């Protein structure tokens, strides 16, 4: 079990490094992981991880060739700037309505759907800039509203 937890920690660190889009070689990734305490990491293991997660080399904003994860595999999280795309959250007796920046609703809805029923979300319907979210059994609309506010760190 301990090695499984260590492996999950390695995968999280590896993905976080690739999201920084600043590593141009496998050797740089090895050194960065070693700096984070993963002493048994080597170039061949990094190479296998790059293949496993579908990492590609592409140009970053500075036009440098760097390793990164494909967009679909880089699962969005609420600690990323996604929360900045949420403009307003409100509710009525039936649904929670979330207004987003134009074009962002489907991305935010995907994140909410990934949380699932255990977090109180039965499902979402997303347009271009609006999301309808309905609570799962055992959750009130108000409970879901408060959970979504907390998720996106919005004020009541």
Swiss-Prot record:
Q: Which GO terms describe its molecular function?
A: arginine binding; cis-regulatory region sequence-specific DNA binding; DNA-binding transcription factor activity
Pathway info:
Amino-acid biosynthesis; L-arginine biosynthesis [regulation]
Query: Highest taxon of the source?
Result: Bacteria
What Gene3D superfamilies is this protein classified in?
3.30.1360.40, Winged helix-like DNA-binding domain superfamily/Winged helix DNA-binding domain
What is one GO cellular-component annotation here? cytoplasm
Protein localization:
Cytoplasm
Pfam families recorded: Arg_repressor, Arg_repressor_C
> Does the keyword Cell division feature in the UniProt annotation?
no
Keywords attached to this Swiss-Prot or TrEMBL record, sorted alphabetically, are: Amino-acid biosynthesis, Arginine biosynthesis, Cytoplasm, DNA-binding, Repressor, Transcription, Transcription regulation
The answer to whether the entry has keyword Secreted is no
The principal localisation class reads cytoplasm
Among the GO biological process terms of this entry, one is:
regulation of arginine biosynthetic process
Return the InterPro entries for the record. Arg_repress, Arg_repress_C, Arg_repress_C_sf, Arg_repress_DNA-bd, WH-like_DNA-bd_sf, WH_DNA-bd_sf
Q: Which family does it belong to?
A: Belongs to the ArgR family.
Give the multimer and partner information: Homohexamer.
The UniProt function text for this chain reads: Negatively controls the expression of the four operons of arginine biosynthesis in addition to the carAB operon. Predominantly interacts with A/T residues in ARG boxes.
Q: Can you say what this protein is called? A: Arginine repressor
């Amino acid at each position: 079990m301990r090695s499984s937890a260590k492996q999950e920690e390695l995968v999280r660190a590896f993905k976080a490094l690739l999201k920084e889009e600043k590593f141009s070689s496998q050797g740089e990734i090895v050194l960065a992981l070693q700096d984070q305490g993963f002493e048994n990491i080597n170039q061949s293991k990094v190479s296998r991880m790059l293949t496993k997660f579908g990492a590609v080399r592409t140009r970053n904003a500075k036009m440098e060739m760097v390793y990164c994860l494909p967009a679909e595999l880089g699962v969005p999280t609420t600690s990323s700037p996604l929360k900045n795309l949420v403009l307003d959250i409100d509710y009525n007796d039936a649904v929670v309505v979330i207004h987003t920046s134009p074009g962002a609703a489907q991305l935010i809805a995907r994140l909410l759907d990934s949380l699932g029923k255990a977090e109180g979300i039965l499902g979402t319907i997303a347009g271009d800039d609006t999301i309808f979210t309905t609570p799962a059994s055992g959750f009130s609309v108000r409970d879901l509203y408060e959970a979504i506010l907390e998720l996106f760190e919005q004020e009541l």
